[in-house]
């Protein structure tokens, strides 16, 4: 186990490059967070684990209270990992319902399924599980079907997904519950190392679609943290269509290991990632991170958020 002193010994160069996270009070634990604001002003935070943890708060600052699980009995999908769901992505549909996409898998596996549930309130006990979206992988494809992210491009609902292997993909939906018939399209790939790229999140701003994603080692810092710069970090590419041709600030294609870093380790923040963007009087980048003054285990992860600034058409914190 990495000791407290070892955690403090992480490179002191990891400071002062980025703004510190916004204030968080109450139960601020989070892992691969999904975030949505209810019409009544309350914020709902969803996290990986069991039947998807739900916390709520009257403001982004909190105080946050864990209130239960979205699917306390797990998923109806008959697949390994269906009692320990990952990477929730929540949005409000045109029909007024809230939809949550989740992943069913096990660590290191490419045998994965993306499921979906719906609710009229986002409260624990209100979620109906609809099972699989029809999007799955078994190792014979180039992709891994986890980390779903929904967006509407024009009139078309799409899911972005993927983790490691051949990277990030996009597929059209036939509706909120099922995928369409078209094949997934590869939109980002990391050719370096172990191809560490995941947690795609697509956000529209000022005529562009910004593809946020996490690169680097996501966890295990409490037993063996990576070389400086190889831990989780948040990168971005952009496209004018949202359907491909994503490039970073230097013009490097996201299919050729491109990606401009938006947020990396600094000060007390180590390995930020699993991110999304909430429109809340401006764009709010949210994520989890491991506090450097803690034990760096997943159980110590914290909810982080920063308001995004836009400089020459690119997001900064």
Swiss-Prot record:
Keywords: Carbohydrate metabolism, Glycoprotein, Glycosidase, Hydrolase, Polysaccharide degradation, Secreted, Signal, Xylan degradation. GO terms for biological process: arabinan catabolic process; xylan catabolic process. Its main location: secreted. GO terms for molecular function: arabinan endo-1,5-alpha-L-arabinosidase activity. It is found in: Secreted. Pathway: Glycan metabolism; L-arabinan degradation. The record marks 147 as: Important for catalytic activity, responsible for pKa modulation of the active site Glu and correct orientation of both the proton donor and substrate. The active site is at residues 32, 198. Coiled coil: none annotated. This is Probable arabinan endo-1,5-alpha-L-arabinosidase C. It comes from Aspergillus oryzae (strain ATCC 42149 / RIB 40). The lineage of its organism: Eukaryota, Fungi, Dikarya, Ascomycota, Pezizomycotina. The gene is abnC.
